[in-house]
Design a protein with these regions (language model features):
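Glycine- and acidic
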Residues: 1-8, 55, 183, 188-190
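Flexible, glycine- and charge-enriched loops at secondary-structure boundaries
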Residues: 8, 12, 65, 168
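Active-site nucleotide-donor binding segment shared across nucleotidyl transfer reactions
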Residues: 20-57, 61-63
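Conserved NTP/Mg2+-binding pocket subregion across the NTase superfamily
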Residues: 66-187
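Conserved nucleotidyltransferase catalytic core and NTase-mimicking acidic/glycine-rich helix/loop elements
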Residues: 131-253
Length: 253
């Protein structure tokens, strides 16, 4: 039996038991959002071998970032629930608590602050993965006043109706443009090319299925996992798996 604890549960306990007591009297927001498999709840025991551990993202007013960061880092225990509170991240060591200002963090991840409004260009320029990172995860505390962290997330929960229809139309067009190609490649004896295009089409259909169900498609490593967790997706997943595993272009079609 695995004793793996999902990162979102670990971080929730870390905030409540360790971080929050260090912030008495400090207005702040706290969450586990942004990059990381645990934010989308796709982490496993394997995830613990890199960039993983008790993590909390703290948001405070800009003028208090340095002060709060120093206070929190000084108060962290060496370990929490058996995990170090300072761990490797892209080859560098850093505390599991990041202290920053909300508006700056949002602009850094998205290119804009959704609390100030989301334009058409904003919607169409942000990758699905970034939208998922901001709207998924969990907010542990939203104490900065309104509009705060939850307001920012709510503004990005899903596309406006007209934008959603445009995004769906674009995705359908991606499928339509290459739909004949597995067969065309096969007709000239290019089984490898047919397989490559077939896999590309499977990826785009997976993304389309998620978009139709109001889910931002994650990047490649988690795309299949996201589809598998979507209710009613088993038949589609089986068909796509058969197409990708096909040994001939006629079977693939």
């Amino acid at each position: 039996m695995s004793d793996f604890v999902p990162g979102i549960e670990l971080s929730r306990a870390f905030y409540g038991e360790v971080v929050a007591p260090l912030l008495t009297g400090v207005a702040h927001g706290a969450a586990l959002i942004g990059p990381g498999s645990e934010v989308l709840e796709f982490d496993t025991a394997r995830s613990a071998d890199h960039d993983w551990g008790p993590r909390v993202l703290l948001f405070v007013p800009g003028e208090r970032v340095a002060e709060v960061e120093a206070k929190v880092v000084a108060g962290l225990p060496e370990r929490f629930a058996g995990f170090p509170t300072v761990f490797g991240y892209h080859g560098a060591l850093r505390p599991g608590v990041t202290v920053t200002e909300l508006g700056g963090w949002l602009r850094g991840r998205l290119g804009f602050d959704p609390r100030e409004g989301v334009t058409l260009l904003d919607w169409l320029s942000v990758p699905w993965q970034r939208l998922a990172e901001v709207t998924r995860g969990e907010v542990f505390c939203d104490g900065l006043g309104e509009p705060g962290l939850e307001a920012a997330r709510a503004a990005l929960r899903w596309y406006p109706q007209d934008v959603w229809r445009y995004v769906l139309a674009c995705q359908w067009r991606r499928v339509w443009q290459e739909e004949p190609f597995p067969g065309r490649c096969g007709e000239v004896g290019d089984e490898l090319g047919s397989a490559v295009v077939g896999a590309r089409l499977a990826r785009e259909v997976m993304r389309l299925a998620l978009l139709l169900r109001r889910r931002y498609p994650p990047y490649a490593k988690w795309l299949g996992s996201a589809l598998a967790r979507m209710p009613g997706s088993a038949e589609l997943a089986e068909s796509l798996s058969s197409a990708v595993a096909a040994r001939s272009w006629r079977e693939r079609e």
